[in-house]
Amino acid sequence: MDSVVFESVRKVFRHRPALFNWLGRERGGETIALKDVSFSAARAEVLALLGPNGSGKTTTLKLISTMLLPDAGTLRVGGFDTRRDAGQVRRQVGIAIASERSFFPRLSARENLDFFAALDEVSRRERRQRIAEVLAGTGLEEHADTLVMKFSSGMYQRLGIARALVKRPNVLLLDEPTRSMDAATTAHFWTTIRALARQQTAVLLATHNFAEAAAVADRLLVLHRGELLADRPLREGESADALRAFYFRMTGEIDEALVRV
């Protein structure tokens, strides 16, 4: 069974221009964030969602996590419909959240992770093992006993990833996970993600980074202005330059953020 299945999923954001809000009028517009998107993600597979800002990558992840719900179409995670069975879906999904408000500032990184691991009602021994693994996998071992209130924004990002990993999810959602990591930590993190996928986890990675997609992904989804333009496997040894050229052929343009990586 596929872990994630999109069938003609559409997401629309309705809004009113500031002028009409100020005037108290109802006139406004809408933005179609996803346009009838269909794809699936299997267990033990890493999917890279590649596209510029506004392409629909983050919306896709939020729909899988049930932070948003589809306006049309069907989305199933682990066989559960995200509209009807949101609670069942959330039990299976881990999503990396880097916000300071997601953690207890006066607890250490280790203590925060222990709290979230305990929500799964696992033994203390199992929690210790999980926490040691995710601290190593995200390069936070040296900061395990540092109060979270002292963390930099980059460390918060890594702690958000660690929180998602400690849950041992069936589906892991990552949004630009390595943007604040140095090269060594990034390489180690990619190894961690590949190992996690081999444990039957479906990983969906939203990224601007061609090198990241080439290093870690099994399949590539190209999103552009809410449309899914391509869904194909990566060839063994396919380079970042090859992915960049493919993206250009599919979209006819390259976003500046994508050119730089």
What label would you give each PLM region?
Residues S65:
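Helix-to-loop junction immediately C-terminal to a conserved catalytic motif
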Residues D114, A118, R125-H143:
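Conserved ABC ATPase "signature" region
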Residues R168:
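Conserved catalytic motifs of ABC-family nucleotide-binding domains
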Residues L172-D175:
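Catalytic Walker B motif of ABC-type/P-loop ATPase nucleotide-binding domains
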Residues A213-A215:
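A short, surface-exposed alpha-helical micro-motif characterized by mixed small hydrophobic
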